[in-house]
Design a protein with these regions (language model features):
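Glycine- and acidic-rich phosphate- and metal-coordinating loops
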Residues: 46
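N-terminal loops that bind phosphate or other acidic moieties
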Residues: 1-39, 49-50, 54-168
């Protein structure tokens, strides 16, 4: 959790009333949040787990699905990567290595924009209209890699809640 706070500068969110660790169970967390009547969720996760959301995989445990390189390679191809780059991404062992390949060929930002659009699509589809939902994806090496469209708004709402709660 410390790397998350460092990567996205969230030391104010140490309050357990506003943070919940959901492990690999993104889909179940969304379903439970709707049942509990929550208004919104801002997920913050490492690229190694959250890239799977761009394929609609809502349980990110490696036993359920490991499509990390496939997702990054497809989005690289969609953003104009040549076959050598796509193969290089597919041959990577971990997302840190894949991000390095994408950064070296100048595609990291475009690929992450494309990935974030798909993450938003699947999160919104799972949440329905009952829940505002957003995600921030980071890596330990690169920091924040991408955000969905409602991430800043949900971040601000949560920050306001924490400040009001603390009487500031």
């Amino acid at each position: 959790m410390q790397s998350v706070k460092k990567a996205v500068c969230l030391p104010q969110f140490r309050d357990e009333e506003v943070t919940v660790k959901c492990s690999n169970y993104i889909g179940d967390t969304i379903d439970d949040a709707k049942l509990l009547g929550m208004k919104g969720i801002l997920f913050i996760g490492h690229i190694g787990k959250f890239v799977k959301l761009a394929a609609g995989v809502m349980n990110t445990h490696s036993r359920q699905a490991d499509c990390r390189m496939e997702v990054l390679a497809v989005h690289a191809a969609l953003e104009g990567a040549d076959s050598h780059t796509v193969r290089s991404v597919m041959d990577c062992v971990n997302t840190s290595e894949a991000l390095r390949v994408l950064k070296e060929c100048g595609l990291l930002e475009k690929v992450m924009e494309s990935v974030m659009e798909r993450i938003e699509f699947y999160l919104t589809n799972r949440a329905g209209e009952a829940l505002d939902i957003a995600a921030v994806v980071f890596s330990n090496e690169e920091g924040v890699l991408g955000k969905t469209s409602k991430a800043d708004s949900l971040f601000e709402q949560t920050s306001r809640f924490v400040r009001q709660k603390k009487g500031r």
